[in-house]
């Protein structure tokens, strides 16, 4: 059934003003009163409806990724990957799929400046012939934590102090001092790329490890990457202050203006793949979201290109009501046992049901563009017009049947029930390698940002010592420089 066919806006084109129920409104300027100066009458239904509507215009803000910008376009396959996946939208070079993409900051509120040091969200909804696929990622290829159990605590630590509503370094560094796996993420966040110049000049990553499955059922672990064809650009501190002080929505404006001018943003889509049969060859766990896969060992393979060539028509319906979930996949793409991904599969859909209601997938931006059929009926704000008499399965009165079976990973798993960390933590090697890959000037800026963070007057000597130990294990010279600068810095 076409979800657009019965949407309320299909008849929202009257030349005269009316109420929500369609009654004509002859005066939208004055309230109904007793005389010209008398009290307002409660029977002024139009006034009550208008104010009540206004009072309910805002919906719950996203708990993370509240500040965002959206655009539409297409994804086109440029290289054959049919040997790796049976996904229909990747079936052959030249195949195009419509998409909608949402960029965002992560921690800060809706309306906050787009020049703050913060990860950026990079989420794509592919409207494929086999249903939607949501690839929900960030601009950095790694994350702070590897187990979803810590996600609420992590967000609380990064968010403002619940007493003062001020984001404070002592809270952030206190929490992450218990999680050395966060070091790798901090080599990105405190690097020059921690403040992207705009959304067009920004990398994207699926972050988590997924699985590609071909028609024969062979599975490969996969990492997804987006590289902007116009290159990566970032803002240093002084530039961020200048840009943010001029326009706190500069990245949204840049995206909108560029598309309107025909300067369409474009990214090349790459994958990295690992055969699960050989995952033990690495000194890290391929399912560890705090690790990257070395490109000299696991090379990037080009797959396609993403082009954004249309601005959205309505911010609320195509940004605020737009909803993503890593659990929404298509045949040929599957999950992995990445602990953070496993948590996200539930968390994202759950928060959308809270934010938008149980029928959020019926909203036009979230509904599939292919035909679909199930017995998910009724519920709050279900506006789908259905005239079936059979709302159960199976039935001899309803011709709907199971879809053809498609392959999913078939590995046999065994183990004890237990709560524990992964065996190959290896928390310090990759952060050290990334720091050493920076040129001296970039290293100096990285160190200065850490000196500033570690100089928070509420940080204890113990917490500072832990961070110096962590960075020394990543790179001895880095630890020494941080210790030297901190010891010579006058106390408050």
From Swiss-Prot:
Main subcellular localization, coarse class?
other
Source domain of life is Eukaryota
Q: Which reaction does it catalyse?
A: 2 H2O2 = O2 + 2 H2O
* Binding residues for heme: 348
Q: Which PROSITE patterns match?
A: CATALASE_1 (PS00437), CATALASE_2 (PS00438), CATALASE_3 (PS51402)
In terms of Pfam families, this protein maps to: Catalase (PF00199), Catalase-rel (PF06628)
Task: Using the UniProt record, name the top-level EC class of this enzyme in a single word.
Answer: oxidoreductase
Q: Name one GO cellular component term.
A: plasma membrane
CDD domains associated with the record: catalase_clade_1
User: Which terms are listed as keywords in the entry?
Assistant: Glyoxysome, Heme, Hydrogen peroxide, Iron, Metal-binding, Oxidoreductase, Peroxidase, Peroxisome
**Which EC numbers characterise this protein's activity in its record?**
1.11.1.6
Q: Where in the cell is it found?
A: Peroxisome; Glyoxysome
Q: Can you tell me which residues form the catalytic site?
A: 65, 138
Q: Which SUPFAM superfamilies match?
A: Heme-dependent catalase-like
InterPro entries for the chain: Catalase (IPR018028), Catalase_AS (IPR024708), Catalase_clade1/3 (IPR024711), Catalase_core (IPR011614), Catalase_haem_BS (IPR002226), Catalase_immune_responsive (IPR010582), Catalase_sf (IPR020835)
Question: In Gene Ontology terms, what is one molecular function of this protein?
Answer: heme binding
Which cofactors does the annotated protein need, by name?
Answer: heme
Instruction: Please name the SMART domains in this protein's record.
Output: Catalase
Q: Could you tell me the Gene Ontology terms of the biological process aspect for this record? A: hydrogen peroxide catabolic process; response to hormone; response to hydrogen peroxide
Q: How does it assemble?
A: Homotetramer.
Query: Per the similarity annotation, which family is this?
Result: Belongs to the catalase family.
Q: What does this protein do?
A: Occurs in almost all aerobically respiring organisms and serves to protect cells from the toxic effects of hydrogen peroxide.
What is the protein name stated in its UniProt record? Catalase-1
Q: Which organism is it from?
A: Triticum aestivum
Source gene?
CAT1
């Amino acid at each position: 059934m076409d979800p657009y066919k019965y949407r309320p806006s299909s008849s929202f084109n009257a030349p005269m003003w009316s109420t929500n129920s369609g009654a004509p409104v002859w005066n939208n300027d004055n309230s109904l009163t007793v005389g010209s100066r008398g009290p307002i009458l409660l029977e002024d239904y139009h006034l009550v409806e208008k104010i009540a509507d206004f009072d309910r215009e805002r919906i719950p803000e996203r708990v993370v990724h509240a500040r965002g910008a959206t655009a539409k376009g297409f994804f086109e396959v440029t290289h054959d990957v049919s040997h790796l996946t049976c996904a229909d939208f990747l079936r052959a070079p030249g195949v195009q799929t419509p998409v909608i993409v949402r960029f965002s900051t992560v921690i800060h509120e809706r309306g906050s400046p787009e020049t703050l040091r913060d990860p950026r969200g990079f989420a794509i909804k592919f409207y494929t012939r086999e249903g939607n696929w949501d690839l929900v990622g960030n601009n950095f290829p790694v994350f702070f934590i590897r187990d979803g159990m810590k996600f609420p605590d992590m967000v609380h630590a990064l968010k403002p102090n619940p007493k003062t509503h001020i984001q404070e370094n002592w809270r952030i560094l206190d929490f992450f001092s218990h999680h050395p796996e966060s070091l790798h993420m901090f080599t990105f966040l405190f690097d020059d790329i921690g403040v992207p110049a705009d959304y067009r000049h920004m990398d994207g990553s699926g972050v988590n490890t997924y699985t590609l499955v071909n028609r024969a059922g062979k599975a490969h672990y996969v990492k997804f990457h987006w590289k902007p064809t116009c290159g990566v650009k970032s803002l240093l501190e002084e530039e961020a202050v200048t840009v943010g002080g001029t326009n706190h929505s500069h990245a949204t404006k840049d995206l909108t203006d560029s598309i309107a001018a025909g300067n369409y943003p474009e990214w090349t889509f790459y994958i990295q793949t690992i055969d699960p049969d050989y995952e033990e060859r690495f000194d890290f766990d391929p399912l560890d979201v705090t690790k990257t896969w070395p490109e000299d060992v696991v090379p990037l393979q080009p797959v396609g290109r993403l082009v954004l060539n249309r601005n959205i028509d309505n911010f609320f319906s195509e940004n605020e009501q737009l909803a993503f979930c890593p659990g929404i996949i298509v045949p040929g793409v599957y999950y992995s046992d990445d602990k953070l991904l496993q948590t996200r599969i539930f968390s994202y859909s759950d928060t959308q049901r809270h934010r938008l209601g149980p029928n959020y997938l019926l909203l036009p931006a979230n509904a599939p563009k292919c035909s679909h059929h199930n017995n998910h009926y009724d519920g709050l704000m279900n506006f789908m017009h259905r005239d079936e008499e059979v709302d159960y399965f199976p039935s001899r009165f309803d011709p709907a049947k199971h879809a053809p079976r498609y392959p999913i990973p078939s590995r046999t798993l065994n183990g004890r029930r237990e709560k524990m960390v992964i065996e190959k933590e290896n928390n310090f090697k990759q952060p050290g390698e990334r720091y050493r890959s920076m040129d001296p000037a970039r290293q100096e800026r990285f160190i200065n940002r850490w000196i500033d963070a570690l100089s928070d007057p509420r940080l204890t000597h113990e917490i500072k010592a832990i961070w110096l130990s962590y960075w020394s294990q990543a790179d001895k010279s880095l630890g020494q420089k941080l210790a030297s600068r901190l010891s010579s810095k006058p106390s408050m």
